[in-house]
Design a protein with these regions (language model features):
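Extracytosolic ligand-binding ectodomains
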Residues: 1-428
Length: 428
């Protein structure tokens, strides 16, 4: 059990700056407020005060009450790393989208716990700094700058925000960033220190367009999206181009989910009267409410298609039977590695999402690189070398040395009715 005498070493990770920055936490700040209790809050207060023995006991007690809380698992692991651990950061939208944040953190927490229980990386355990950027570009840049300035941080997992605004900061600062969730195309040209574990937007839209036109036989498709979400706009534009390239037609309608007093019924009527026999709908992951109006008014009249954003438990829970047949292109599905999915579900007491598994693999990739070269530049060089190959939960992992993109293809899934309700199932 860690003693009070290690507090100065842990505090030194970000001291004195991190203690004053509530967005960066090794355990001294509560970031995920929706999955908390008074015991966890007392544990975090104890860490901030240097009473790590008390904090460890309180975190264990909190996890007995809330075993699916990854933030607590990470903070508990951090208390048990001893001296001279490797330190990485993970950046999540802790306040604006705590569900997505926890999906990412569960993957990182599982990988951290696993490697530390095995004795660490060449004898050095792994400490994880949790960072909140709320998917906001300006905050992303600010926390990225702070992480770059800290020489102890050797790699970053994130950001979830799709605009890649922080990538140039990591590139300039020589700090490896590996995105486990963002399909943004501009990550492919962001520099040598930027990597991506999921398929690019180009690959995702190409695969989905091929299914829409050639498999689902949708000749005319209409589009609903949030014009205030840059990732929505770029995904919509790329999918439109790919659909047209494959011989499909775009039905022009006014269906902007971001406008005040959005009228879903008018948009659906316009699409149907225009001859659409398919509908693509997508929204910002933090602003899904208008989507359910579209889904409700559609009443399964038009087959639905969407981006990876819709591989989300809320789509199933709030969409119900009206989302049956929804087809989405995603990086991963549990059926591709059912044994691993079952283990993760047992650990976290909830279904495993693709974000959890890609974040687990992102952490495993960093761990593998650190075994061979435990420096910022050396880690980047190893992953970029062209002969880095791993087989992890999501399958074979290697990176294009020119772009940093993972080599591989997305998976098509569709909502089907099952005895336990609507579920996403993979398409053959």
């Amino acid at each position: 059990m860690i003693g009070w005498f290690l507090f100065p070493q842990i505090l030194a990770i970000f001291a004195p700056k991190a203690d004053n920055n509530p967005s960066i936490s090794y355990g001294n700040h509560l970031l995920i407020k929706t999955n908390s209790n008074t015991t966890k809050e007392s544990a975090i207060a104890a860490i901030a005060q240097g009473d790590h023995q008390e904090a460890e006991q309180l975190l264990q007690k909190s996890l007995a009450q809330r075993p699916n809380d990854p933030e607590s698992v990470i903070y508990l692991s951090n208390l048990q790393t001893g001296s001279n651990p490797f330190k990485i950061a993970v950046v999540v939208p802790a306040t604006t989208n705590p569900n997505v944040a926890q999906e990412i953190l569960r993957g990182v927490a599982s990988a951290q716990t696993q490697i530390n229980q095995q004795g660490g990386i060449n004898g050095r355990k792994l400490m994880v700094i949790v960072v909140n950027d709320d998917n906001q570009p300006q905050i992303s840049k600010e926390v990225a700058s702070e992480l770059v300035k800290n020489p102890d941080i050797i790699a970053v997992i994130g950001h979830n925000a799709p605009d890649a605004s922080a990538a140039p900061i990591y590139e300039k600062g020589g700090l490896l960033m590996i995105s486990s969730t963002s399909p943004a195309n501009n990550l492919s040209s962001a520099g040598n220190y930027i990597f991506r574990l999921v398929a690019s937007k180009s690959n995702i839209t190409e695969k989905l367009a091929n299914y829409i036109v050639n498999t689902a036989k949708v000749q005319k498709i209409a589009f609903c999206y949030d014009s205030q979400a840059p990732d929505n706009v770029s995904f919509k534009d790329e999918l439109m181009a790919n659909v047209a390239k494959k011989g499909g037609q775009i039905v022009p309608i006014v269906c902007d989910l971001s406008v005040p007093n959005f009228k879903a019924d008018q948009a659906l009527n316009q699409a149907i009267s225009g001859g659409a026999n398919g509908l693509f709908v997508v929204a910002h992951v933090d602003r899904l409410d208008p989507v359910f109006e579209v889904i409700r008014f559609n009443r399964q009249r038009l087959p639905l298609f969407s981006s990876p954003t819709f591989y989300n438990i809320r789509i199933l829970e709030d969409g119900g039977k009206n989302v049956q047949g929804l087809t989405v292109a995603v990086p991963w599905h549990p059926s591709l590695n059912q044994t691993f999915a079952n283990l993760m579900q047992e650990q976290w007491r909830s279904p495993v999402s693709w974000r959890t598994v890609t974040s687990f693999d992102a952490t495993r990739v960093i761990i593998a690189g650190l075994r061979e070269n435990p420096q910022r530049h050396g880690l980047q060089f190893r992953l970029r070398s062209g002969n880095f190959h791993r087989t992890e939960a999501t399958g074979k992992i290697s990176f294009d040395p020119n772009t940093g993109d993972r080599i591989g293809q997305p998976v098509l899934i569709q909502v089907r009715s099952t005895p336990s309700g609507e579920q996403f199932v993979p398409l053959p």
